């Protein structure tokens, strides 16, 4: 047993979910915590004989487990909550239509070192045959090639992003889950892991960590039939990729300060450090006069809201609350932006 939290967000897939949980129980290395977010019918599964027995096995295996009735707002919100609820630094994100090979977690851990932000293996649909050379998990190939996880993996590969299921380090997820997406959460895993990569963490694919994707036409995100949600998420995805290109490649950052006067003065303390890291610093300020002598570009909060899909995720007080922050706000600003 390892200090790992397995997280599953589910919606109306209780049969599939039982397969996932049974395959977690039968891992050669077992996580010591399992959290399931139920966004569906929210049944009392203790009344189901299959589930009643699964719960007994979880008890026998000493796996600390809980089922949390979600807000029915989609898996991204549930995954974001898991960052606050999970008791462990390592979190195993698993989809509710997965079937895990018995040694999947053991082999993920084998390659998980201090530089690793997230690590995944093959995510295979039954009776599919993608060729490795035709696949890619590079951001620039996302519209041209199948995902690299859909084909055989025979050695460690360093990639830009992961999808579906992966093991990750909680401290590498300082920005949280992309809760600016719709309930569908289209591109969630890509945005989540690619930002880790941009922050300097290794994102890896490794061999012998197979997960079968028992893709289901109903339940889960396929409960949402609103095509506009997918279009909106795709637009936000492309907007974030362009923002990150500016921030990480051209060293140009936009920071919204939608808070009080004192918070602006606190933020002012880190401007010299920001200028060391970035060539161009733009601040969306409620009190722009605080920065009149700092030689930074200033824009309005309204402009920042139009530019940043993740505007609300960057609120310093929301971030401190999520991260149970106990230090000074200046240190919070440093942690978030430096």
Question: At which residue positions do the language-model features occur?
Answer:
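Glycine-rich, basic loop-to-helix element that forms the pyrophosphate-binding segment
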Residues: 70-86
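Conserved donor NDP-sugar-binding/catalytic core segment of glycosyltransferases
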Residues: 105-136
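Acidic donor-binding segment of Leloir-type glycosyltransferases
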Residues: 25-68
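Catalytic machinery of carbohydrate-active enzymes
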Residues: 248-338
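Acidic donor-binding loop at a coil-to-helix junction in glycosyltransferase catalytic cores
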Residues: 185-192
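A recurrent flexible, glycine/aromatic-enriched loop bordering the glycosyltransferase active site
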Residues: 76, 148-168
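Short beta-strand-to-loop acidic/aromatic patch adjacent to the donor-nucleotide binding site
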Residues: 89-97
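Short, well-formed alpha-helical segments that are part of the catalytic scaffolds
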Residues: 13-26
